Amino acid sequence: MKVLVTGFDPFGGESINPAYEAVKMLPDEIAGAQIIKREIPTSFTRGTAEVVRQIELCQPDLVLNVGQAGGAAGLRVERVAINLADARIPDNDGAQPVDEPLVPGGAAAYFATLPVKAMVRGVQAKGYPCQLSYTAGTYVCNAVMYTVLHTVQSDPHIRAGFVHVPYAASQLEGKAAGTPAMPLADITAALAAAIEAVVQNKTDLKEQMGRLD
């Protein structure tokens, strides 16, 4: 089994992106699966194109894209991606689409095809904070998640999803007091736990993780 795991390059004035910093520290094998690690640009155009190119090149069984969610207290396993780009800040190419579809005429949304609840429980079982999320935002993270799910929708052999990670502790300088973060080693270990859960669970858990907000 091959797992393609991607992380973004730095954006928004940050010197690092904990997504790729953690991804590149992952072991080359998790639960018997080969881990293929790639960096992709934080760009609506180039990021989506690169992840599709990597899928074509690597022919993975599983795709897990990883992005930074500054302000998150732990990992967020994303359940849904929407066909909308509404960028609060420009991407790394200076593009700032507002209220634009990612794929004109495409589905309004796609659900992750990974066992998202099993991933949450797998990370929590290792002692790391993690929750199920029902919005991947409207920036490049959502764009990549949507594009991947749109690309693999006709191939049931490939399952895909997205995880957001918090700031690394090394990014806290200059940020407001109380801004949550995790040590980079912990982010990496939590990602490994999420991947292990994906490899070991072809179907998801049947338990309540809904929200009222």
Language model segments and positions:
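N-terminal catalytic or cofactor-binding beta/alpha core of small enzyme domains
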Residues: 1-136, 149-157, 177-213
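An accessory alpha-helical subdomain
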Residues: 164-170
